[in-house]
């Protein structure tokens, strides 16, 4: 069974967690921004919306 040779330092652990959390924050901001633009109708959205799907059928 694979076992780490040495304990990871707290600073390295914290740095990795900070990177991971920052990526999550950036993705959350993008999602919120996209949601706001869709609600205001200012978006040029790539995926078809429910209204467009109904018109095509």
UniProtKB/Swiss-Prot annotation:
Q: Which organism is this entry from?
A: Nostoc punctiforme (strain ATCC 29133 / PCC 73102)
Please name the InterPro entries in this protein's record.
Answer: Ribosomal_bL32, Ribosomal_bL32_plant/cyanobact, Ribosomal_zn-bd
Q: Which parts of the sequence are annotated with region: Disordered? A: 1-22
Enumerate the GO terms in the molecular function aspect. Answer: structural constituent of ribosome
One GO cellular component this record assigns the protein to is:
large ribosomal subunit
Top-level taxon: Bacteria
Query: Which Gene3D superfamilies does the record match to this protein?
Result: Single helix bin
Q: Which UniProt keywords apply?
A: Ribonucleoprotein, Ribosomal protein
> Per its UniProt record, what Pfam families does this chain match?
Ribosomal_L32p
Enumerate the PANTHER family for this protein. 50S RIBOSOMAL PROTEIN L32, CHLOROPLASTIC, LARGE RIBOSOMAL SUBUNIT PROTEIN BL32C
Q: Which family is this sequence assigned to?
A: Belongs to the bacterial ribosomal protein bL32 family.
Please name the HAMAP family in this protein's record: Ribosomal_bL32
Q: What is this protein called?
A: Large ribosomal subunit protein bL32
* Disulfide bridge map: none
- Which biological processes are named by the entry's GO terms? translation
Asked if the Swiss-Prot or TrEMBL record annotates the protein with the keyword Zinc-finger, the reply is: no
Name of the coding gene: rpmF
